[in-house]
């Protein structure tokens, strides 16, 4: 029976970007499928009872995180450029549209490349439209979904279900009753899937 990796991510997360760099190949090697599940990290933290400051507000922590991000990007041989803003909600919602069109992997990969590889401004709707078009999605339909009450409702429902499941950050990968948090847990995930 094919196992499913529930991949909880937020385009605001550079560590989710790094996980997405490796996750599709990992899934193919292990015969799994990925279910892409966008969340909102600040909202997830609060839902889990974490009311502390964001990582960007803790100066010693952000210095270490920045160094780690550079190391991971070099290890994975991918570009890493901080985006012009962290307003990624529309992109998260758009991932649900892409999932409904069986284009989640392509869209998420292309979106992460734009946001964290190139460093675009996620607030720029032309970037969102361009990303949709690059992977063969109808940009008008995607943007309409993102703006619609139905699309926003689907995104809200997806987030609520994630938090009820215990999602408190990203990236998080769930398989069976196992949880793997962070791109640095991909080896553990692969070992579990191969056992």
From Swiss-Prot:
> What GO terms are given for molecular function?
2-hydroxychromene-2-carboxylate isomerase activity; glutathione peroxidase activity; glutathione transferase activity
User: From the record, what ranges are coiled-coil?
Assistant: none
Q: Which reaction does it catalyse?
A: 2-hydroxychromene-2-carboxylate = (3E)-4-(2-hydroxyphenyl)-2-oxobut-3-enoate
What cofactor(s) does the depicted protein rely on?
Answer: glutathione
The record lists substrate as bound by 45, 55-56
**Co-factor remark:** Glutathione seems to stabilize the enzyme, which loses activity rapidly in the absence of this compound.
Q: Which residues form the active site?
A: 13 (nucleophile)
Domain of life assignment: Bacteria
What activity regulation does UniProt give?
Activated by salicylate.
Top-level class of the enzyme under EC nomenclature: isomerase
Q: Give EC number(s), comma-separated.
A: 5.99.1.4
Q: Where does glutathione bind?
A: 13, 181-184
UniProt keyword list: Aromatic hydrocarbons catabolism, Isomerase
One GO term of the biological process aspect: naphthalene catabolic process
Instruction: Please state which protein family the record places this protein in.
Output: Belongs to the GST superfamily. NadH family.
Its job? Involved in the naphthalene and naphthalenesulfonate catabolic pathway. Catalyzes the reversible glutathione-dependent isomerization of 2-hydroxychromene-2-carboxylate (HCCA) to trans-O-hydroxybenzylidenepyruvate (THBPA). It can also use 2-hydroxybenzo[g]chromene-2-carboxylate as substrate.
**Name of the featured protein:** 2-hydroxychromene-2-carboxylate isomerase
Organism whose genome encodes this protein: Sphingobium xenophagum
């Amino acid at each position: 029976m094919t196992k499913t990796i529930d991949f909880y991510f937020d385009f605001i997360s550079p560590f989710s970007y790094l996980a997405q760099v490796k996750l599709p190949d990992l899934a193919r090697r292990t015969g799994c499928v990925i279910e892409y599940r966008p969340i909102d990290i600040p909202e997830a933290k609060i839902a889990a009872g974490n009311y502390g400051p964001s990582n960007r507000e803790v100066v010693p922590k952000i210095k270490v995180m920045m160094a780690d991000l550079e190391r991971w990007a070099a290890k994975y041989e991918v570009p890493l450029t901080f985006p012009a803003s962290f307003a990624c909600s529309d992109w998260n919602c758009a991932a649900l549209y892409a999932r409904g069109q069986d284009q989640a992997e392509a869209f998420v990969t292309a979106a992460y490349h734009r946001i964290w590889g190139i460093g675009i401004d996620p607030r720029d709707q032309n970037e969102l439209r361009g990303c949709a078009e690059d992977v063969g999605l109808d940009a008008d339909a995607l943007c309409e979904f993102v703006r619609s009450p139905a699309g926003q409702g689907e995104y809200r429902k997806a987030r609520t279900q994630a938090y009820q499941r215990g999602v408190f950050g990203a990236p998080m990968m769930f398989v069976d009753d196992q949880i793997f948090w962070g791109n640095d847990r991909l080896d553990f995930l692969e070992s579990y899937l191969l056992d």
